[in-house]
Amino acid sequence: MGMNNIKVRTKLVIVMVIALIALALCAVISNTSLSGLGNNALDIIENDMRSSYDEQIKAQVDNVISLCQSIYNRYEKGEYTLDEAEKLAADQIRDLRYGNNGYFWVDTYDGTNVVLLGNDTEGTNRMDAVDTNGFAYMQAIINAGKQEDGGFTDYVFPREGETESSPKRAYSKAFEPFGWVLGTGNYTDDIDAVSYTHLTLPTKLEV
């Protein structure tokens, strides 16, 4: 009888151990699944945010290209000289805004700035300008703009009044009749914050 009790107890212990192991495995699998689901959701959100941002700044530049084209068409009809047409376009672009703080800049193919908020940079050559990391961002912006459908450029710069660099993303496109590259862009901290959450999410779920 005593031996039977020992065998029963042994069996119960084995069953309990197996049950605990099974529960632990279920917890690990569940946690991993939650982490995967969370990361997949963040992937979708991040991709949507990046796509939406890219579409917005590209659409804004395309609108300005259309403005330049309409002015150039009037030049071709003899309403303006070429210099007058370029000045009219530059003056209008300088005043354009979108969103909270969106604006546009214009540079010639050789890097001479035509439009930048009316500040002292206008009229100077910034082809060799570099960002905080030493990246020649203006060369990249101009080269991207001269592609058939324009292009995007990522670089880093401190916000006004700050010393720490923040990521920026620009879209630029050429308007060949004037020999210009038009661009706009903005800081992308909000999108990068989603990427950071993506990287830290598994750890948070496992705690």
Give short role names for the model-derived ranges.
Residues 31-65, 76, 83:
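Juxtamembrane membrane-water interface segments immediately C-terminal to a transmembrane helix
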